[in-house]
Structures are given as structure tokens and as C-alpha cells.
Amino acid sequence: MKVIFLKDVKGKGKKGETKNVADGYANNFLIKNGYAVEASNAALSTLSAQKKKEDKLAAEELAEAKALKEKMEKLTVELKAKSGEGGRLFGSITSKQIAQTLEKTHGIKVDKRKMDLPEAIRALGHTKVPVKLHHEVTATLDVHVSEE
């Protein structure tokens, strides 16, 4: 029997796949538990429409991320911190502080976990911080730390 998987089934198929499986397995397990539906013409057309919708949504997200990247790479995030001799900070600047300042000053909301800051900034000056906006798009944000 040909079925369309609605959920991932380990060892059998992934969501959205169309596969031939044994009739008993399809009726007694997959269809009964909601893991799959029988592959009729109506179900196949629904699946193709759903895939087109998902592809369109993914393309929109990618375009949005690219536009945000263009905007972010022109910005400089200004932060002030107390520092000692040689430009070393008392404490550090974290991705959370960068995200909050970016939202407050420029109105761009970015999750702090998207910032690829290996360790906190502990010195005055300019630092380039990579920000992962999409799995294909990474922007580089310029962070300037000056003395308070």
C-alpha cells in the first residue's frame, strides 16, 4: 500500500515522504496511529500544495534574513563600560548586553543565542561579532566598546 507519512517514523520514512509499505503495517499501525495517510490523488495534491507553501515560506524567511543582514552590517553598536589600565574592562560585555543595546538603539530584536561570541568582550575598542540570522545567512555586527 502506498502511504504519505505525516510524521517521521524511524526506519520507515520522514514527514512528507511517499512510500510503499505492507498493507497490514499501513492499516494497523501507521494510519491507525496517525503517522500516515493512504496516498490517494486528493492526499497527493494536498501534499504538493503544502510543500509549495512551505517552500514559499522558506524563501520569504531567507529574503528577510538577507535584508536584515544588509541593515545590520551598516550598524555599529555603541556600549560603554568601566575600564582599568591598558583598556581592560572591569567585568565584560556579553551577547545579552549586545542584544539589548541593539534592540534599544536600533529597534532590531535578535536572540542572544544567535550571536556567535566565543567569549565575552573584555577590552575597549571595535569587535566584529558574527550573528546567525538563518542557517544560510550570517551577518557581522560591529560592536564598539568605549570607556564610561
From Swiss-Prot:
GO terms for cellular component: ribonucleoprotein complex; ribosome. SUPFAM superfamilies: L9 N-domain-like, Ribosomal protein L9 C-domain. Keywords: Ribonucleoprotein, Ribosomal protein, RNA-binding, rRNA-binding. GO terms for biological process: translation. Gene3D superfamilies: Ribosomal protein L9, C-terminal domain, Ribosomal protein L9, N-terminal domain. HAMAP family: Ribosomal_bL9 (MF_00503). Binds to the 23S rRNA. This is Large ribosomal subunit protein bL9.
